[in-house]
Amino acid sequence: MKTPSPNLVATLMLAGALAATVRARAQAWGLPELSKESKACLECHKQDNTGVYQQWGASKHHRANVACFECHMANEGEPDAFLHEGYRIATIVSPKDCARCHSKEAEEFANSHHSKGARILGSLDNTLAEVVEGNRGMKTPGFPGGVSAAAVSGCWQCHGSEVKVLANGKLDPATWPNTGIGRINPDGSEGSCSACHSRHSFSAEQARHPDNCGKCHMGPDHPQMEIYYESKHGIAFRAFKDKLNMDSSKWVVGEDYNLAPTCATCHMSATPARPANKDRPALPAQPVTHDVGMRISWNNRPEISVRPEISDKKLGLPGAEVNWQTRRNHMKAVCVNCHEQQWVDNFYVQYDSLIDLYHQKFAEPGLELYKLAKPLMNPVQFANKLDWTWYELWHHEGRRARHGASMMGPDYTHWHGTYEVAKHFYSKMVPELEELVQKGRASGDPAKVAAAEALAKKLDEVLNQANHNWYLNKMDPAEKAERERRQQEFQKRYAK
């Protein structure tokens, strides 16, 4: 690059002018022309990074004359700022940088659970990746004592790393590259816009595609992508994805497309105003939102599902003031563009009933039993069979059941969900609890004997409840007789 170095004042003036131009709407969108700084960047990078240059060239940023320097510019004193060919820049473009033009989106994102994704230290998931699966074998300047490669290449790539800037200005290789949704950036901001808006094309069509979300929302513990593709929504998307106008600037369900929803449709995208009818009041239009929790009415992440305003309060988010009923109405305003009101209302009855079943039959008694078993167990996490059984029961199988019901995935609700929960509750957890009771009673330790008696009493109480008494062969005789009659009829129809 041969362009002379701009001084700090010029850099600050450019940043201010860019933000002011956008805020004041001096023109429809973008800048009047490419800045001389970005032109200088492009002289080299169109040769050195052809793919980056071509992606940007096909993007709306290119059409808006927003280029390298407008995004990568940095101020003196920023932790990751460095001089490059006379320009002060930063490698990482953080949400704070994107907010120069996209302030509304950045604020909504900052108020979402997505931006807090890296706050996983201390979780059982993190213990698994760092200790049980991992070791301290990956040593870097930022982690001289070592860090787990399983955490670096696994958890952190979705949840986000805490990016460390080294003494020489470079970024620690354990923490970068990283586009995790909750990445903690050197400028103090949380999140990564490029988790969804992949650089350097920043395609709305790609961000709206279900596979974009599926990078993280998949697998045994949160298989939203697999559930979506099993559902009628996913089937419709595969059939009609070329007819959904997914590259449209304005993308309003019921106006710009109607043949299928994507994840973005339900959780983020705009909805039109709808007049009142006999089943509901008038619905105002909803704008696009980057707070993906504003339309969900259950947080299904923990052992026992909680209402989203409760988890928002724990994170100190403004959503603590938005109750689940309001959020559900926001989601229903999406649904009614393709479904009539009774269909929508009845779906939520089904969904809530599955949550209640999971809670009442397995999660609530299971959690209480697990806590009572703790004094009889090795205190080291995941050093006991029961640790693994209980963890997978709620973290994998229990989530699959709940997520399956939330997105109309029957196989994930039943066979991958409640079936697995029940199988492991009765065939693993109950026998493991009984074994702990037996060992505790025989230990000779008064504290363990007392703990064993308390656990035995609770287990007996749980198994004698109506939800579980079939296990003790105590099912109501009339119901038992009726089920035997149905089984006989089934055998007559299908037995050879």
Please report, for each region that a protein language model flagged, where it lies by residue.
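Bacterial N-terminal signal peptides that target proteins for export
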Residues: 1-11
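Bacterial N-terminal signal peptides
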Residues: 10-19
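Short sequence/structural segments immediately N-terminal
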Residues: 25-496
